[in-house]
Amino acid sequence: MSHYSMIDTYFSLDEDETETYLYLCRDLLKNKGEFQCTRDAFKFLSDYACLSAANQMELLFRVGRLDLIRRIFGQTWTPDSCPRYYMPICSPFRCLMALVNDFLSDKEVEEMYFLCAPRLESHLEPGSKKSFLRLASLLEDLELLGGDKLTFLRHLLTTIGRADLVKNLQV
């Protein structure tokens, strides 16, 4: 993975896409300490060659930036077009959380934060942006959410009236 492609990706993604990209990379960034900004996280991924070109194409595909795949790598990419020996970098759980994030409105995310307030009280930073992926990360840290722990999320989605998304969690 060249530094150029990481730099190009960093400058091309908007704030929400960057959050999704880094959430999908969370397993790679875990136990590496806290990054002061997203630029530091991208620098870490670039400096330590955590992502191959195929991995970065998968992440951009999951974020929905097919235009960047074509511009940076000069080709198209789909999960079916990768070789059989290629292991996906995004766990099914992280892909599912990114999918749920795409279908929630800001109002629904606010409702979820309100419902989780007693549990998150000491973990929330005042004035920080509230997003579903941030909430999912906090719930993972509190061990209330994980690949095998979706009950709490099902309850939250049912409470805010999003039974349609609960059906996606059955996978």
Swiss-Prot record:
InterPro entries found in the cross-reference section: DEATH-like_dom_sf, DED_dom
An annotated GO BP: regulation of apoptotic process
Keyword match Nucleotidyltransferase: no
UniProt xrefs under SMART domains: DED
Keywords: Apoptosis, Host-virus interaction, Inhibition of host apoptosis by viral FLIP-like protein, Modulation of host cell apoptosis by virus, Repeat
Any Pfam family the entry gives: DED
Gene3D superfamilies, per database record: Death Domain, Fas
Domain DED as annotated: residue spans: 1-74, 92-171
Role noted for this protein: Inhibits TNFRSF1A, TNFRSF6, TNFRSF10 and TNFRSF12 induced apoptosis. May interfere with caspase-8 recruitment and activation at the death-inducing signaling complex (DISC). May lead to higher virus production and contribute to virus persistence and oncogenicity.
Assembly and oligomerization: Associates with the death-inducing signaling complex (DISC) formed by TNFRSF6, FADD and caspase-8. Interacts with FADD.
Annotated protein name in UniProt: Viral CASP8 and FADD-like apoptosis regulator
